[in-house]
Amino acid sequence: MTKTKIMGILNVTPDSFSDGGKFNNVETAINRVKAMIDEGADIIDVGGVSTRPGHEMVTLEEELNRVLPVVEAIVGFDVKISVDTFRSEVAEACLKLGVDMINDQWAGLYDHRMFQIVAKYDAEIILMHNGNGNRDEPVVEEMLTSLLAQAHQAKIAGIPSNKIWLDPGIGFAKTRNEEAEVMARLDELVATEYPVLLATSRKRFTKEMMGYDTTPVERDEVTAATTAYGIMKGVRAVRVHNVELNAKLAKGIDFLKENENARHNLS
């Protein structure tokens, strides 16, 4: 049975929209990682820069100071480690310590050394769709064009296709209607040769799905609904805050999807 990967979010920042300040010292970060592993995480995604609306850009030095001590403390755990960064300097420092993948919210467009660095360490990379929100074509077409172009550049740099993940970038440079369009057409991204990661956890999109004001934590059940929907559309991994809920749900959906496929194969 194909297992959907669960990526647990570890923000080592003081200002992330959902859990800023909760895990930004090594001891609390270690405890959170251990808990997420017990809850079913396959990957831990460590981020040292907030992506919330209105966040302030931190310096390279500050990002390194936030991320490296935590990565060094957890890199030996029995789980894949990803680092959420768009800076090749941060990526290389973490890859030297033994992390497995880089989650680049700018898909290599911010730092053109990123692909070379990831290839050098034979690591995986996640390419997320982003931008300034201005586009000359419909959102899904623009997303596919942009991500496939960057994936091609990653392959030229020496990263094999099976180590390149695509993320549609829910919550980034899209209107509410554009996000709904991207979700409805996830199968078109899945139809490419690359595995797809879906990252909707606690974002504005899930708030708007509920139709009333909520705190980020109150969006976990709706996040789980997007997990189920994404798996049925063919995504291979989900990035979430509430690991336990989504891991259990994914296990059930994986079973049902496998059962459905087996029945179709018999008919």
Curated annotation (Swiss-Prot):
The keyword Secreted does not apply. Its EC number is 2.5.1.15. Residues 1-251 form the Pterin-binding domain. InterPro entries: DHP_synth-like, DHP_synth_dom, Dihydropteroate_synth-like_sf, Pterin-binding_dom. Its cofactor is Mg(2+). It holds the Pfam family Pterin_bind. It comes from the Bacteria. The keyword Magnesium applies. Pathway: Cofactor biosynthesis; tetrahydrofolate biosynthesis; 7,8-dihydrofolate from 2-amino-4-hydroxy-6-hydroxymethyl-7,8-dihydropteridine diphosphate and 4-aminobenzoate: step 1/2. Catalyzes the condensation of para-aminobenzoate (pABA) with 6-hydroxymethyl-7,8-dihydropterin diphosphate (DHPt-PP) to form 7,8-dihydropteroate (H2Pte), the immediate precursor of folate derivatives. This is Dihydropteroate synthase. The lineage of its organism: Bacteria, Bacillati, Bacillota, Bacilli, Bacillales.
